[in-house]
């Protein structure tokens, strides 16, 4: 294991990250305020004329230590921060600025990683849709898939210990420990998703920072194992993992960890060029071409390593290995599965001809119609059966605002589900939104749907066209075949970075 020592050592320059003095800089809090992650405008409630100075921050830190303002309960997350006194005010103010400060070394390493790998359009790799072309290319050659929930730490202190190998500033980490470890009382007696929800609502930026560092530490195990058994380098890994090293756990160096957990007799199990990993929304996918026995080896080795040496909670019994041809994945809003694509090929050799049936596997991405209708029913666009209804809360708005809201939602859904291999479900969603829009307008003008449609005609339906549909209708006004081919084809957009709520206007 001596050849791994240079790989496992901490970077020298990381030892010179002194971030604590930045806590007392006014522009840090102005920067955190401009990001707008917390819309409650916390600085307005302090009475210091929207400015943060050295004296103000010292007072806030002193009050945090002297008074019990860090206890977070379920009632605090629903408290109106505009009314009265908010006991989490001080911690929220400083945690926002502190999160911006700790992000500085991460941003610098990301920029240096992009420059080293000569990645020009890294924003394309951050798109949600960029995952699907990868799956289309790799999944037809794989046999088994496992949907794994990313393990969570057994205590918030683990998040601080993970972050201390990224940020070499004890003073800053002591303050981070104050925000994290003392902010949750009786951690072991509470349910983790509930704590995650409360903590993310009260300190969203700080929570994302801690969670991303935890995920990066969790994924560094996979990158470490892969890099040891393949001579070629992975350029893309430098973008997502700026740190790839391990450290001592319970006085045992990492060399002994791998020597004990992965003896030489079983290391060949990891020499699998067809093992692929994808992460999404707190879950991850492990897919392989191997037999189930080897995948089970992967599962138990990784789970044991995560539990014993990364202090995270994960159970092998909750990880299921499924045959890819018989299993569908609920993946980023799509139902993805493998289906055979049959084709007939005729081969001519001299005077003889042969007809051969070729069956090729193809990734099938479907629109989840039932969950989408449930979401539309939840925000009162239709009932539980999918029948459109009027949006009564929007009836007081102008006609332009009503149409604009419906059109925006319809176009966003069409944009996101443009990669669907079957568009009939998407057409039904568009129909619900169009008719709901008409019913809302008819309700506002105290008219019937039929009368209102006669008055507007086809102008209203044209508003619901996407940009691509509108351009094609102008180029080919009489040719419907081109539009049909466009609807059938799958298009993945590289400008989608998050999945917004259907309705975010209210």
Swiss-Prot record:
One GO BP: tRNA processing
Entry-linked InterPro entries: Domain_X (IPR024937), Maturase_MatK (IPR002866), Maturase_MatK_N (IPR024942)
Keyword annotations from UniProtKB, A to Z: Chloroplast, mRNA processing, Plastid, RNA-binding, tRNA processing
One Pfam family here: MatK_N
Name by which UniProt lists this protein: Maturase K
Family (UniProt): Belongs to the intron maturase 2 family. MatK subfamily.
Subcellular location: Plastid, Chloroplast
Lineage: Eukaryota, Viridiplantae, Streptophyta, Embryophyta, Tracheophyta
Gene name of the encoded protein: matK
Role, per record: Usually encoded in the trnK tRNA gene intron. Probably assists in splicing its own and other chloroplast group II introns.
GO cellular component, one term: chloroplast
UniProt-recorded Gene Ontology molecular function terms: RNA binding
């Amino acid at each position: 294991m001596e050849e791994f020592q240079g790989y496992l050592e901490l970077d020298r320059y990381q030892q010179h990250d002194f971030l604590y003095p930045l806590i007392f800089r006014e522009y840090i809090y102005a920067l955190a305020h401009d990001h707008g992650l917390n819309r409650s405008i916390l600085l307005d409630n302090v009475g210091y004329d929207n400015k943060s100075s050295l004296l103000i921050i010292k007072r806030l830190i002193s009050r945090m230590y002297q008074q019990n303002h860090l206890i977070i309960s379920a009632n605090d997350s629903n408290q109106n921060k505009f009314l009265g006194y908010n006991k989490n005010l001080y911690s929220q103010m400083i945690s926002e600025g502190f999160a911006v400060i700790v992000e500085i070394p991460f941003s610098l390493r990301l920029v240096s990683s992009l420059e080293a790998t000569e990645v020009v359009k890294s924003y394309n790799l951050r798109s949600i849709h960029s995952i699907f072309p990868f799956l289309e290319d790799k999944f037809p050659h794989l046999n088994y898939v496992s949907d794994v929930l990313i393990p969570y730490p057994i205590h918030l202190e683990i998040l601080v210990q993970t972050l201390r190998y990224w940020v070499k500033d004890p003073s800053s980490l002591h303050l981070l420990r104050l925000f994290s470890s003392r902010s949750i009382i009786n951690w072991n007696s509470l349910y983790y998703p509930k704590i995650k929800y409360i903590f993310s609502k009260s300190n969203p930026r700080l929570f994302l920072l801690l969670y991303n560092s935890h995920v990066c530490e969790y994924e560094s195990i996979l990158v470490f194992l892969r890099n040891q058994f393949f001579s070629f380098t992975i350029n893309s890994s430098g973008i997502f993992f700026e740190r790839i090293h391990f450290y001592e756990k319970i006085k045992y160096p990492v060399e002994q960890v791998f020597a004990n957990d992965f003896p030489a007799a079983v290391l060949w199990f990891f020499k699998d060029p067809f093992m692929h990993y994808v992460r999404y929304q707190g879950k991850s996918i492990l897919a392989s071409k191997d037999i189930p026995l080897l995948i089970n080896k992967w599962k138990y080795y990784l789970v044991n390593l995560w539990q014993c040496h990364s202090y995270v909670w994960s159970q092998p019994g909750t990880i299921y290995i499924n045959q890819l041809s018989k299993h569908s994945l609920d993946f980023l809003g799509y139902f993805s599965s493998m289906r055979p694509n049959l084709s007939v090929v005729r081969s001519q050799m001299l005077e003889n001809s042969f007809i051969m049936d070729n069956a090729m596997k193809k990734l099938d991405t479907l629109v989840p119609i039932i969950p989408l209708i449930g979401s539309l029913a939840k925000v009162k666009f239709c009932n539980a059966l999918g029948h459109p209804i009027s949006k009564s809360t929007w009836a007081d708005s102008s006609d332009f605002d009503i149409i604009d809201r419906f059109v925006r939602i319809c176009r966003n859904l069409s944009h996101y589900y443009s990669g669907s291999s079957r568009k009939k479900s998407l057409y039904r969603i568009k129909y619900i939104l169009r008719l709901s829009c008409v019913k809302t307008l008819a309700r506002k003008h105290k008219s019937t749907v039929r009368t209102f449609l006669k008055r507007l005609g086809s102008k209203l339906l044209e508003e619901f066209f996407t940009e691509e549909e509108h351009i094609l209708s102008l180029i080919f006004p009489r040719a419907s075949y081109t539009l049909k081919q466009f609807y059938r084809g799958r298009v993945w957009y590289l400008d989608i970075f998050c999945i917004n709520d259907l309705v975010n206007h209210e």
